[in-house]
Amino acid sequence: MDQDRSDNTALRRGLRIALRGRRDPLPVAGRRSRTSGGIDDLHTRKVLDLTIRLAEVMLSSGSGTADVVATAQDVAQAYQLTDCVVDITVTTIIVSALATTDTPPVTIMRSVRTRSTDYSRLAELDRLVQRITSGGVAVDQAHEAMDELTERPHPYPRWLATAGAAGFALGVAMLLGGTWLTCVLAAVTSGVIDRLGRLLNRIGTPLFFQRVFGAGIATLVAVAAYLIAGQDPTALVATGIVVLLSGMTLVGSMQDAVTGYMLTALARLGDALFLTAGIVVGILISLRGVTNAGIQIELHVDATTTLATPGMPLPILVAVSGAALSGVCLTIASYAPLRSVATAGLSAGLAELVLIGLGAAGFGRVVATWTAAIGVGFLATLISIRRQAPALVTATAGIMPMLPGLAVFRAVFAFAVNDTPDGGLTQLLEAAATALALGSGVVLGEFLASPLRYGAGRIGDLFRIEGPPGLRRAVGRVVRLQPAKSQQPTGTGGQRWRSVALEPTTADDVDAGYRGDWPATCTSATEVR
C-alpha cells in the first residue's frame, strides 16, 4: 500500500513537472497597486493629462493605435502611474487611473477631430518621450515642453512644402514610366493640387470634396496634354491618384488590423474607402464632362507599368531614382527634419530595388511589395534606434511610392469606361492586397529588428546607443519600468516626484505598441472622478 502511494505521488509530481509552464500574465488593468504610496490625486491628474496630450499628437498624424497606446503607457509608468489604462476607439482617447484602496478613479476622455502632419514635431515628441522614460524630466517640465512643441510653427515655409509635393509627384511619374513632359506636368499639377487643398482646408471644405477637386484637376490636365501634345494621359492620372492616396489611412488601417485593433482598423479603412470614392467621383466627372464636350480620348491603361520587372539597366535606374526622389520630397512636404531626408530617400530607393529584383525573379506584385515593406520596417527601426529620425518618417517615405494608385485607376477605368465589372473588381482586390502587404510588411520588419533595441550581441551594440532604450515596440522583448538610480528631476513648484527609467526585462506583463506623431484640434474633453 505504501509502495503504491509512493508511486502515485511520484507519478503526480512527474505530471506536474511535465505540464508545468508559464502562467498567463494578469492584464495591466487588473492591477490595483501603484508604484509609490506618495502619489496624490493632483499628480495623477497631471500625468493623465500629459499622456492624453501625447496620444492626441500621435493619433492626429495617423499613427498606429498600438503605438499610441504603448507610448502613453510608457510615459504614465515613468511617473509611477503603473495602473494607467489607455483605450483608443477610432478618434476617441480615454486614459484612466484605476481606483485603489485609498485613491478614487480618475478618467480623462478627448476626441481628435482634425488631422495634420508635421514630422518635425514628431521628432521633437520622440526625443521628449525618450527623456521622460529615462527619468530626467519632471511632470511639470514635460507639460511646459508640450506647450512649446504644439505652439511651434512649421520649420519650413509653405512654398517649400508645396515644392516637396511636386517633387513627390515627379518621382511617382518616373516610377510609372512617364516621359519627361509627363513628369514635368505631374509635378506642376501636384503643386497646384497642394495649393488648392490648403485653400479648401482653410475654409473648412470636407476632405471628400478636396479629393474630388484634386482628382478632377489631374484628369483635366491629362486630357489637355493629350489634346495639345499627344501625351498618353494614363500616367498623369495615375500619378495624381498616388499623390492623393499618400495622405490617406489605408496602410494605417492594415497596421491596426494586424496589431489587434480591429474596430479602429475598420473605421480607418472606411475613411480611406470613402476618400478613394471622392477620387473616383472626380475622375468620372471630368471624363464625363470631356465626353459631353465632344472630345474623344483613348486611355491605354495597360500600357503603363509600375516598372516592377524592367529588363534594362536604364529603366531600373529611373525607377530607383524616382522612388528615392519621391521619398526625399515626401519628407519635405511633411515638414520632416532635414537629417531624416537622406535616410527616407535611401529607404524608398532600396525598397524599389527589392521590388524590381523580386519582380524580375518571377514573384507576384503582392509578394514583392510585402517583402519590400518588410525591409522598410526593418530599416526604419534601425534608424530610430540610432535616433536619427522617428521610425514613422522613414517607414512612411519608404512605402508611399508602392501605394496601389495604378490599380485604383485601372479599376475606375474598368467600371466607368470599359464597362467591365469583373476587371474592375480584380483591380480593386489587387489594390486591397497591396495595401495589406504594405501594412503587415512594415509591422513584420519592425518585429524582426526589435531585438536589436535590447542588446542582440555585437550587432545590437552597433545599432544601439548607450542609455535606456526609450520607447518600446509592439513586438519583441518587453520592458519593465524600474526606479532610476540617483535621479531626482526638479519641477516647477510643489513636491518633487521621482521619475523612473526603462530597463529591459524578460517579463511579459505590459502591453506592447510601436510609435507616432503630431497635434490636432480636440473636442469633447471630459474628466470623470
UniProtKB/Swiss-Prot annotation:
Transmembrane segments annotated in the record for this chain: 88-108, 168-188, 212-232, 234-254, 265-285, 312-332, 344-364, 365-385, 389-409, 428-448
Membrane topology summary: Multi-pass membrane protein
Subcellular location: Cell membrane
Region annotation (Disordered) ranges: 482-501
Keywords annotated in UniProt: Amino-acid transport, Cell membrane, Membrane, Transmembrane, Transmembrane helix, Transport
Stated induction or repression of this protein's expression: Expression is significantly increased in clinical isolates. Expression level is positively correlated with lung cavity number of TB patients.
Catalysis: reaction(s): L-threonine(in) + H(+)(out) = L-threonine(out) + H(+)(in)
GO biological process: amino acid transport
GO molecular function, one term: transmembrane transporter activity
Domain of life of the native organism: Bacteria
Gene Ontology CC annotations of this record: cytosol; plasma membrane
Consequence of gene loss (knockout): Deletion mutant exhibits decreased growth rate compared to wild-type strain in standard culture medium. In addition, the mutant shows decreased survival rate in macrophages. Infected macrophages produce a significantly higher level of TNF-alpha and IL-6 mRNA expression. Knockout of the gene increases the susceptibility to amikacin (AMK).
Main location: membrane
InterPro entries given in the database record: ThrE-like_N (IPR010619), ThrE/Ser_Exporter (IPR051361), ThrE_2 (IPR024528)
Keyword flag Membrane: yes
Entry function: Catalyzes the export of L-threonine and L-serine from the cell to the extracellular environment. Export is dependent on the proton motive force. Required for in vitro growth and survival of bacteria inside macrophages. Increased expression is associated with low-level amikacin (AMK) resistance.
UniProt family annotation: Belongs to the ThrE exporter (TC 2.A.79) family.
Protein name as it appears in the record: Probable threonine/serine exporter
